Amino acid sequence: MGAAASRRRALRSEAMSSVAAKVRAARAFGEYLSQSHPENRNGADHLLADAYSGHDGSPEMQPAPQNKRRLSLVSNGRYEGSISDEAVSGKPAIEGPQPHVYTISREPALLPGSEAEAIELAVVKGRRQRERHPHHHSQPLRASPGSSREDISRPCQSWAGSRQGSKECPGCAQLVPGPSSRAFGLEQPPLPEAPGRHKKLERMYSVDGVSDDVPIRTWFPKENLFSFQTATTTMQAISVFRGYAERKRRKRENDSASVIQRNFRKHLRMVGSRRVKAQTFAERRERSFSRSWSDPTPMKADTSHDSRDSSDLQSSHCTLDEACEDLDWDTEKGLEAMACNTEGFLPPKVMLISSKVPKAEYIPTIIRRDDPSIIPILYDHEHATFEDILEEIEKKLNIYHKGAKIWKMLIFCQGGPGHLYLLKNKVATFAKVEKEEDMIHFWKRLSRLMSKVNPEPNVIHIMGCYILGNPNGEKLFQNLRTLMTPYKVTFESPLELSAQGKQMIETYFDFRLYRLWKSRQHSKLLDFDDVL
């Protein structure tokens, strides 16, 4: 759109410059002819009309139909000068050059239909025909014998009644109102050339006469000039597009930056975990030579005490602790043995069920009904703590049999390979059971609730997830066994479809009801109460 407008502007500017050049050349040559040959006083007008008519044939000067431009050029100054010369000399009007009026028009109303875009050159003959026809609009005028005898029968009254009227054709304005003597002013002295009229003759472009519904414009097309409204609209569109492009570019940059930051954080997590496994914080600090200025100066350990004395104190303290533990162990073992010697005693089996398991509320209803030693404990995954779980286990054991301890235990919770999801924000992994104090305390207290009189190692089964699907699962079990020493505890997490898994399920559940519960565990179509 911009390229087409600029191309049109270039064509119009070239056309106007060529018109101006031709007009100047014709006027200069006409002046030369009028000076060298006085009988051709109107030579400039001939050449000026020829320049316009010759130029109008060029395709780039054909205006758009809606412009309806008209260029009127009247040689009234030279016409009046020739008439005054004839009046003073007293010679007949037929002798000497005949006055002419040249009119170049683009008005469609003044031209034939087939030549709506052509230029009409009207040659009005001299005084004799005007005296013969005083009202020249009553009969059409004929061209001079030397001309092409073109019919110029359109009345000058219609020219004078056009939109521009006598402003552009003052010669016609003189011819319209009265007879020939008053129209040509033969008795009057020669009128001096009006400066405004001469100026209009010298101009190469005049005011346009256009239709009433279109505002009057000059020879310069309005769209070639600077239009503030169009420019403002274009600037607004450009600014809107620039803002849209800027927002898209900023969004792309933010997305790429977030991806880079996310990948870098992931890289730091991976590298940091390996570094923690490789060396402790103290070792890293000792080996680090680039300390911050705010770090305290590392001080050597106080060696004033003899190392031999400190080692003796540590060994004696350990000996006292072991003696106390042995005494407690023997006391607790005797009490448990006394409780188990009663008739009909069955070693308790504790089921610890997390509420996070789907349809966990139905699990207590599918346990083995022929085994009263199974103690189901359903805890709240979201709000319970390790202390709450331990207190509930102790309370249920005392209710079952005072002084009884756990022989077998089932932990039914969510998790995955290498980790147990015991509580909200409490995930048991092989690293966390070594570092987090509350988790270490939980497993140590749980070990004290395990049986001491069981000739076989106590068993803790894990259901709801497959811990051993990852090598970290075996590390987790190993760390838990280390935490629960001196009690003999083993951890098992077999697949439910295996033989060991079937044996584990039959230890705690009615196998038929368990399969039914498992098939309806993730279903919302049928309520499990109806099945039971």
From Swiss-Prot:
Post-translational modification: Proteolytically processed after NMDA receptor activation. Cleaved in a calcium-dependent and calpain-sensitive manner. Calpain cleavage is essential for the translocation process from dendrites to the nucleus.
Induction of synthesis: Up-regulated by gonadotropin releasing hormone (GnRH).
GO MF term set: calcium-dependent protein binding
UniProt biased composition (Polar residues): 155-164
Compositionally biased region (Basic and acidic residues): 38-48, 302-311
Composition skew (Basic residues), residue ranges: 127-139
GO CC terms, sorted: apical dendrite; cortical cytoskeleton; cytoplasm; dendrite; euchromatin; membrane; neuron projection; nuclear envelope
Tissue: Preferentially expressed in immature migratory, in comparison to postmigrating, gonadotropin-releasing hormone (GnRH) neuronal cell lines (at protein level). Expressed in adult brain and liver. In the brain, expressed in the primary pituitary gland, cortex, hippocampus, olfactory bulb and thalamus.
InterPro entries: NSMF (IPR033374)
Record's keyword annotation contains Phosphoprotein: yes
Lipid group attachment sites (N-myristoyl glycine): 2
Role description: Couples NMDA-sensitive glutamate receptor signaling to the nucleus and triggers long-lasting changes in the cytoarchitecture of dendrites and spine synapse processes. Part of the cAMP response element-binding protein (CREB) shut-off signaling pathway. Stimulates outgrowth of olfactory axons and migration of gonadotropin-releasing hormone (GnRH) and luteinizing-hormone-releasing hormone (LHRH) neuronal cells.
Family that this chain belongs to: Belongs to the NSMF family.
Assembly, per entry: Interacts with KPNA1; the interaction occurs in a calcium-independent manner after synaptic NMDA receptor stimulation and is required for nuclear import of NSMF but is competed by CABP1. Interacts (via the central NLS-containing motif region) with CABP1 (via EF-hands 1 and 2); the interaction occurs in a calcium-dependent manner after synaptic NMDA receptor stimulation and prevents the nuclear import of NSMF. Cannot be competed by calmodulin.
Name listed for the protein in its UniProt record: NMDA receptor synaptonuclear signaling and neuronal migration factor
The organism of origin for this protein: Mus musculus (Mouse)
